[in-house]
């Protein structure tokens, strides 16, 4: 790839193409990161709501960039007596498409760290990249699902609130409901006691579990508790179609980065990885999803659990 000057940058500043793990002549010597990339999708299962639903088979898998015809009026069957007329049904379809989305996580570490990396160090880098990709995935996934989702007022009873959510979302016998909560809400459900002092929901832990047979997932991107109370999201995985590509991990010792969590556009002060004896590690993930039934998601707010 020919280096190209970034927009708004002076002629002395050029963009450097990143080396990839599959290029032995460039960044393939960072062989340890092949292990990180290989384990990404499996490890994301416990970090990301999207990946958990995907791994469980709750989300119907459709290839990315696929044109969809979504049935909005289902056909109905009838019992027909001998010699009787057979009712004819009509259907309605809505056109949609499974567009691809991209999330990335970028970190920079010194080469001294890489050269002296132990298994614990590699695990740390893997954890940071995994967490970044998982958080960005759920931010896109839950943010899109909640944009037009119906909201239900909560109460003091988790079971009553779950029942109200199920009445909205789980309208078919083949539904695959998942309850998504924030970490503090998971803590509250885990430690909630009955009037006799016993754990109200033995299947719950701070990292998730289940309530009344419904899997509970924990995400930083779920509605956080506030002065009005706790919140939660009930998602029917069967109302979602989607797909995901493999997470790619790239490394470059020659990139020039704007070391900021909120990078600005235009000409900026860049830091050379080569000059600072550092390496940039970039995790990239392409995925997509589409809610094909508007009642497939419901939000709970103001619960006093």
Question: Language-model features: where?
Answer:
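Protruding loop/beta-arch "assembly-hinge" segments enriched in small, turn-prone residues
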Residues: 2-18, 24, 49, 269-305
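Assembly/oligomerization interface modules of large self-assembling protein complexes
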Residues: 3-103, 163, 296
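A broad, low-specificity signal marking well-ordered, structured residues that form hydrophobic/aromatic
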Residues: 60, 65-66, 98, 105-107, ...
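Structured loops at beta-to-helix junctions and adjacent beta-edge loops in soluble globular domains
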Residues: 65, 69-71, 110, 182-184, ...
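Short loop/turn segments at secondary-structure transitions that flank enzyme active sites
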Residues: 74, 113, 135, 139, ...
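Alpha-helical scaffold segments that mediate packing/assembly in large oligomeric complexes
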Residues: 86-88, 93-176, 192-196, 299-300, ...
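Extended oligomerization regions of viral-like shell subunits
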Residues: 151-279, 285
